Regions:
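Iron-sulfur-associated redox domains of electron-transfer enzymes in respiratory
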Residues: 1-162
Length: 162
């Protein structure tokens, strides 16, 4: 959510000046319910290009590896993460939770929380140590609790413009 506080460049600059197509954001997305679900499925199936998949928050695998403790658009969030990460040209983890599992991953970790490509300091995490995006890159981590908003927008501009 710190992304919305970015100043240089701000969210409007990202869209207007740099041409980023913000497909969906929990605070800005107009699609809800079935419309949001269709949008995610279109991206996951490759029917809509997904250049940069940005994920914020920990991946929750409880209970018993099902991920059903964290449901979104009719499925466990972890299933969306798998499908969208595999469809994306670039995957970006924002914040300590997405990068490393954050505070929720501390023992005894009842939620089964982990980061995208790291679990705490150990390479691996939810997507595994060998994950690479369609562009051949590992997960790009922007740590912080929260991540600095300008780091987020500046890195997105750098990725989008090559």
């Amino acid at each position: 959510m710190s992304f919305l506080n970015a100043e240089e460049p701000n969210v409007v600059d990202l869209i207007v000046d740099f041409g980023l197509d913000l497909i969906w954001h929990p605070s800005l997305g107009l699609e809800l319910g079935n419309n949001a679900q269709k949008l995610f499925w279109d991206c996951a199936k490759g029917e809509r290009p997904l250049d940069i998949f940005v994920f914020e928050g920990t991946v929750i695998e409880a209970p018993d590896g099902t991920g059903r403790m964290d449901m979104f658009a009719g499925r466990p969030m972890k299933d969306w993460v798998t499908d969208l990460a595999n469809a994306a040209q670039i995957v970006v983890a924002i914040g300590d939770c997405a990068c490393f599992g954050g505070i929720p991953a501390m023992e005894p970790n009842p939620s089964g929380s982990t980061g995208l490509q790291f679990h705490k300091r150990q390479k691996g995490g939810f997507l595994g140590p060998d994950f690479t995006s369609r562009m051949g890159l590992p997960v790009i981590n922007i740590p912080g609790c929260p991540a600095h908003p300008d780091w987020i927008t500046q890195i997105l501009v750098a990725l989008a413009t090559g």
